[in-house]
Amino acid sequence: MARIGFVGTQSVGKTTLVKELAKLPQFEYYHVATERSKYLRDLGIPLNTDSTIKGQTVFLAERVSELLRDNLITDRTIIDVMAFTLEAKSIEPGVKADFLYYAKQFLKEYDYIFYIDPSGIEIEDNGVRETNNEFRDKIDFNIKNLIKSYGGLINNLHTISGDTDNRIRQIMNVLKF
């Protein structure tokens, strides 16, 4: 059993990947957490550059609540929340720094984090995510910088790429399933 998180900019296939992994017998007893952005948006929480410190705190609380489980597969991690916080226009720089300092405390709770490389993957409009390529690149840049900055707090970080089947093979090799 492990806490497994996937990190990556929007529209790289995190949710699709988690749903496919959930079908495998090795993950039968895992809690699967996906697509919380739509749910939270429907509660009235602003997303992307419109997000607020309250909104990002709710997103962080969602991720932390997932970490209360010993067997977890999630399509978002605390790193994702941190990366989007950095792009929120209404949050002051000092508040962003304080938020990141607090959020990083939970990174060590993941047993594995898989970063999904966005190279060659087109943005899909699901009605929730931002479809602007420049914004997507900023989020990916933030994610990479956060991984560099806080990598020492991450137990097992792996980069995966390719189509869903190739990604699953890479994950299973890492997890030794």
Residues covered by each model-derived region:
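Pre-Walker A (Motif I) flank of P-loop NTPase domains
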Residues: 1-3
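Hydrophobic anchor at the beta1->P-loop junction of P-loop NTPases
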Residues: 6
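The conserved Walker
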Residues: 10
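Short amphipathic alpha-helices and their capping/turn segments at secondary-structure boundaries
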Residues: 18-24, 56-72, 97-110
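Conserved substrate/cofactor phosphate-moiety recognition/catalytic segment
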Residues: 19-65
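Conserved nucleotide-sensing/catalytic segment adjacent to the nucleotide-binding pocket
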Residues: 45-93
